Design a protein with these regions (language model features):
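Early-domain small/polar-rich strand-loop-helix modules and first-structured segments
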Residues: 1-38
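Helical "lid/coupling" subdomains associated with nucleotide-phosphate turnover
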Residues: 6-9, 23-26, 46-77, 85-135, ...
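Ser/Thr-glycine-rich phosphate-binding loops at phosphate-binding pockets of nucleotides
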Residues: 16-18, 85, 142-148, 214
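Beta-strand-connecting loop/turn residues
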Residues: 17, 29, 144, 153-154
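A common structural microfeature
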Residues: 18, 77-80
Length: 310
């Protein structure tokens, strides 16, 4: 990009639970959002158990991809990147999905490794945060995996573990509310993964824990007492650890219908918020963080910034 010129980019993040699009104009250190959207497609449905995509999950995701491509064409986008993460890494039939996306977009989707996923999440989450809050520990709780990224202006260490909210729901929390046995088994699994991440990433050196993605922002909405979801109220809100634990316990005690009735709850997150909030609660306990900074900027924004730098 020539200095002083703006470039219009389209970033697509394809996770285990959601497909998201960001179209933005970027000039220097300024990002102007043109369009942002999320669809719950649950591409990773059953992948933890079957190690393969369900045909209906591929179909849902490709339909949404086509709708996104129609928008991208209408917005005169100059650069586009499609990044697929945890579920696509794990699926034995991922080539069926990759070929389908290529046929729609005319470019190959990138199945990025956990380390790159972590770096992009870090870039997106920390871009607009004051350096006086560094070093940062960015925690990205996705549908299939959770990334832990430590850094200041650059990533110093990162590790990805398979404790996403969809994976934990399918593996452990199969009823709502979950049983004590299900919760205990989930905690055992989650804690082991966090401790593994801690052997690669020194949690104690971080000054600020930034939590990104839908689990963290939904927990923030609950902690803030929002009547409906408000991304502007959530972004950069400080949520004390005790409130995280209380929110996780609240979700674990509710029925599916009670969760669905919450005004800030996205319909596609109803069956995974209990597991997701449990992961975040265990992260707070095992890292020793006293609060987290909620961020609406994440891997999607990181993909966009990366495109502008090409």
């Amino acid at each position: 990009m020539v200095e002083g010129e703006s470039v219009r980019v389209a970033a697509i993040d394809c996770g285990t639970n959601s497909l998201r699009l960001l179209i933005a104009d970027i000039e220097g250190n300024n990002l102007r959002e043109v369009y942002r959207d999320m669809r719950i497609v649950r591409l990773g449905q059953g992948v933890d158990r079957n190690k393969a995509f369900a045909p209906e999950a591929i179909e849902r995701t490709l339909v949404a991809t086509q709708e996104y491509f129609d928008l991208i064409r209408a917005k005169d986008v100059q650069r586009i990147r499609f990044c697929a993460t945890s579920a696509t890494r794990d699926a034995s039939n991922r080539n069926l999905f990759i070929d389908g996306v290529r046929d729609i977009l005319g470019i190959s989707p990138e199945v990025i490794p956990g380390v790159e996923e972590a770096a992009l999440s870090f870039l997106g989450a920390t871009k607009g945060v004051g350096r006086e809050l560094a070093p940062f520990l960015v925690v990205d709780i996705g549908g299939g995996s959770t990334e832990f990224v430590l850094g200041e202006s650059e990533v110093l260490a990162a590790h990805s573990v398979n404790i996403g909210c969809v994976r934990m729901s399918e593996r452990h929390l199969t009823s709502q509310p979950p049983t004590e046995k299900q919760l205990a088994e989930a905690v055992f699994d989650i804690d082991a993964a966090i401790l593994e991440a801690g052997s690669h990433v020194n949690f104690k050196t971080a000054h600020t824990l930034i939590a990104v993605a839908g689990t963290a922002t939904t927990v923030a909405a609950a902690a803030l007492g929002l009547v409906e979801y408000d991304r502007y109220a959530i972004h950069l809100a400080r949520i004390p650890a005790q409130q995280v634990h209380e929110v996780a316990e609240m979700f674990a005690a509710m029925t599916r219908e009670e969760i669905a009735a919450l005004g800030y709850m996205h319909p596609g997150r109803i069956d995974v918020i209990t597991s997701g909030s449990l992961v975040l609660s265990r992260v707070m306990r095992l890292t020793g963080a006293t609060e987290f900074l909620a961020s609406e900027s994440d891997i999607l924004d990181g993909i966009a910034w990366g495109l502008a730098a090409l």
